Each structure stands twice: as C-alpha cells, then as structure tokens.
C-alpha cells in the first residue's frame, strides 16, 4: 500500500482551520487534478480528479466515506474506487504548535487491486506522496490567504 504523510505550518485561528477541515467540500476542491465532486450525504461524497499515473493521465472517481471525526482535531475517511479498483484511506489533522500557529497534517494510503495491481501499485508509490504533499500545501495556502 502506498502511504505518505505531509505537514505544513499555518498561521491561523484554530476555529477557522477546523471549520475548513470539517467541510469536506472545501478541501475536495483543492485535490490536485480536481474535476468535480458530488455530496451524497453528510458522510459520503464522490470525487473525480485527473491523476497522472506514470505514462497515463486519466480521470479517476472515488467514493469518500467519513469514518471518524474528532472535533477540533481530525477528520478521517475511506476511499473506494468507482472507476478503478483503487481503494484506501486518509485523514487531515490539525495540531497546535503555539498560539495562532498550527500544523496541518495530511495522510493518504492507496492500494490497487485486481489484475492490474502489479502494474498500478508501483505507480501509486510515486503518486501518493506527490498528491498528499500538493493537497496539504494547497490547504495551507488557502487557509493562510483566508486569514490575511
């Protein structure tokens, strides 16, 4: 399973950061390669994004199911491939470093299944770290600009 965690420091108010992280529609729009999303319920949504998987660039659809919310701390989710046999999980977490400064931590795990797994999993080893790094950077930049 491809796994990566990325952390960015942001200067912001904790309530503003949690409000943003709690609203999955907000951070869905910041996914690298974002194409669209659709909210299906309070705990489920569908993401569609364009991923660069080595020599192939393609649109991928995944079902996102919120599995855990720790208020003012963490939101965790499961991913289930709709268009492809790629599943995983992830989370976003906020950690106060000092007053007005927070680490935004993002984690993503993805694994391909099926007959193409042997080809896709090595590509995910490169894709997952790049994706979570870019996503957390985009979240940090968005939060920083919103609080200026």
Question: Language-model segments: which ranges?
Answer:
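Short amphipathic alpha-helical signal-transduction/dimerization elements
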Residues: 124, 128-147
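Short strand-connecting beta-turns/loops that link adjacent beta-strands
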Residues: 13, 42, 71, 97-101
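Glycine-rich portal/gate segments that line the openings of hydrophobic small-molecule binding cavities
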Residues: 38-80, 134-142
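Hydrophobic ligand-binding cavity/cleft-lining segments
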Residues: 1-46
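Beta-strand/loop substructures that line and gate deep hydrophobic ligand-binding cavities in soluble
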Residues: 79-130
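Generic structural detector for well-ordered beta-strands
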Residues: 7-11, 38, 65, 78, ...
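Intrinsic-disorder/low-complexity, polar/charged segments enriched in Ser/Thr/Lys/Arg/Asp/Glu/Gln
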Residues: 2-7, 44, 61, 74, ...
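Hydrophobic/aromatic beta-strand elements that line small-molecule binding cavities or substrate pockets
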Residues: 34-35, 61-68, 88-96
